[in-house]
Design a protein with these regions (language model features):
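Extracellular/periplasmic loop regions
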Residues: 306-351, 439-440, 447-500
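Active-site proximal loops enriched in glycine and acidic residues that flank catalytic Cys/His/Asp
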Residues: 262, 374-376, 410-412, 425, ...
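Solvent-exposed loop/turn segments connecting transmembrane beta-strands
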Residues: 351-355, 381-388, 413-422, 444-454, ...
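Bacterial N-terminal signal peptides
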Residues: 1-8
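Feature captures outer-membrane beta-barrel proteins of Gram-negative bacteria and organelles
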Residues: 284-291, 357-363, 388-400, 421-437, ...
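Extended, well-ordered alpha-helical scaffold/bundle regions in very large, multi-domain proteins
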Residues: 297, 303, 311-312, 417, ...
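Structural preference for beta-rich elements and adjacent junctions enriched in aromatics
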Residues: 11-399, 405-407, 417
Length: 501
């Protein structure tokens, strides 16, 4: 009986689906289980014994292509309403794992793992879910496309948890709902993650394939490892992802969030010797978020209250020629913000200072990203003091081939009888994994105090990302008078070029 049991256990362990990254087994048939597990950092429930196992990581930095020094194993399965990940990260150098109860997103200087889910399987944009050894969360998006976000994200991802600042844009401003818990164990750490499907936008196909990249940061050595072997001699990091195959019968449920807010204030002052004089004031506001479909989300807001939003980090203005640049942190604007991204930051939502009301639709239909935003700004910036500007923004981007895109953008800011309008197109073409070319042509039309003008903005970039050598050549021409009132173009009347080798 004992021998039979041992043989059964050994046979069961051997037949677990194992996918070796270094063995190029990058197509993962993810198991669908009618099960749940407690998110406690302990991978001891029966569901984990039936999960797919991602093993044999490769080093990405400092030397890509080598076998990872520290072993990492990622378990993955999904239930009807969520996808689950279990992480076993081994450490062979003793008690050197760095893990603290850091603030959300601030785990870049600690041992951590990032899971990138490309739910549209287009190798262009992925949801980012990161955790340190204690389960402290990091989340956002990662894109190979552009170097600047609509909410003020820089090409290096703002320096908060960016795995490699040379590979696309990491935006950690969005926050998603997911569960995680981790713990230190002998020889490393373990983390358990549950991501509900209602936190994601994904395709409408009955059977789906999702792109997946898993990255591990080993803090004491500075090494960065990936499950799918990734080389830096490639113009697309997400293009080197693996694939989760066969996801079906996903239950997202009703995605409807209502956030009513009431704010009251009572002021008192000793106006007379007999007593105080009191005055009161109050405001009502509300937000709604509706997941119309798996791939489309509608947001609305009326008189939004941003008093609980994290304050901006102070900046010192030394050169008055350029405006200060702040990231977007307001919840209404953050949801789906990555779909508004353009080259050269033609959309910058911080231009809408104090919205009185707004509506936004964002998502992906077939091979086209769609993002629209309409809002009234309560912050009057006119000379007369009686105008509330209206903002309208539309961004479309169509997938071409494996990684290339063709996009268009329309923006307008209407302020009384004045206006600032813009239309543009951009093209990004990849070739032979090493090269990409990015072209953009934009025209602005402005009418202010009865004076009309029309001015162009043109830019071009040619890039090669290679192991031995690479380059990035670019030129930009912005005519004097070009005006993008809904974007962040901090200097006009210039022609400049850059050469990096």
């Amino acid at each position: 009986m004992l021998i039979t049991t041992l043989l059964t256990l050994a046979f069961g362990q051997d037949t677990l689906p194992v996918y070796s990254g270094r063995g190029n087994q990058l197509s993962v048939a993810i198991p669908r289980l009618e099960a749940q597990a407690a998110v406690d950092g302990r991978l001891d429930e029966s569901a984990w014994s039936r999960a797919a196992r991602l093993t044999d990581f490769s080093q990405f930095q400092p030397v890509d292509g080598r076998a990872a020094e520290e072993a990492t194993e990622v378990l993955v399965w999904y239930a009807p309403d969520a996808i689950w990940f279990g992480i076993r990260a081994r450490e062979n150098h003793g008690n050197v794992v760095r893990a603290t109860r850091a603030n959300r997103d601030n785990i870049a200087s600690e041992d951590h793992v990032q899971i990138l889910l490309d739910t549209n399987n287009d190798r262009r944009l992925a949801f980012l879910f990161g955790v340190n050894a204690l389960g402290v969360q990091q989340d956002g998006t990662r894109s190979d496309q552009f170097g600047g976000g609509a909410g003020g994200q820089s090409a290096t991802g703002g320096g908060t948890g960016n795995i490699n600042p040379l590979d696309g844009t990491v935006d950690l401003n969005p926050d998603y709902v997911f569960e995680s818990r981790g713990r230190l164990v002998d020889g490393g750490y373990e983390v358990e993650i549950r991501i509900p499907f209602k936190s994601l936008r994904y395709q409408e196909a009955e059977v789906q394939n999702w792109g997946i990249h898993v990255l591990r940061r080993v803090q004491h050595s500075g090494y960065q490892d990936t499950w799918a072997p990734a080389v830096r001699a490639n113009a697309s990091f997400l293009g080197q992802s693996g694939t989760l195959t066969g996801l079906r019968e996903l239950r997202r449920g009703l995605v409807l969030e209502l956030t009513p807010t009431a704010v009251a204030r009572l002021d008192g002052s000793p106006e007379t010797p007999e007593g105080w004089d009191y005055a009161s004031d109050g405001e009502l506001s509300g937000d709604v978020r509706w997941g119309i479909r798996q791939n489309l989300t509608l947001n609305g807001t009326v008189n939004p209250d941003f008093s609980q939003v994290e304050a901006d980090v102070g900046q010192v203005l030394l050169n008055e020629r350029f405006s200060l640049f702040y990231p977007e942190k307001r919840p209404f604007f953050l949801d789906g913000l990555e779909l508004f991204d353009t080259p050269n930051q033609l959309i910058y939502t911080r231009r809408i200072v104090a919205p009185e009301g707004g509506v936004k639709l964002a998502g992906k239909v077939a091979s086209t990203n769609i993002a629209t935003l309409l809002a009234f700004d309560g912050k009057d910036q006119s000379w007369t003091g009686d105008h509330h500007p209206f903002f309208g923004v539309m961004r479309l981007r169509r997938d071409l081939g494996q990684n290339s895109t063709l996009g268009g953008v329309l923006t307008t800011r209407e302020d009384g009888g004045d206006y600032s309008r813009l239309a543009g197109a951009d093209l990004r073409l990849y070739h032979s994994r090493l090269y990409y070319v990015e072209l953009q042509a934009v025209q602005s039309w402005t009418d202010s105090a009865g004076v009309s003008r029309s001015n162009p903005y043109l830019s071009a970039t040619w890039d090669r990302t290679g192991r031995q050598w690479g380059f990035n050549y670019g030129v930009r021409a912005v005519e004097d008078g070009f005006n993008d009132a809904a974007g962040f173009v901090n200097r006009t009347g210039v022609i400049d070029a850059h050469i990096f080798n």
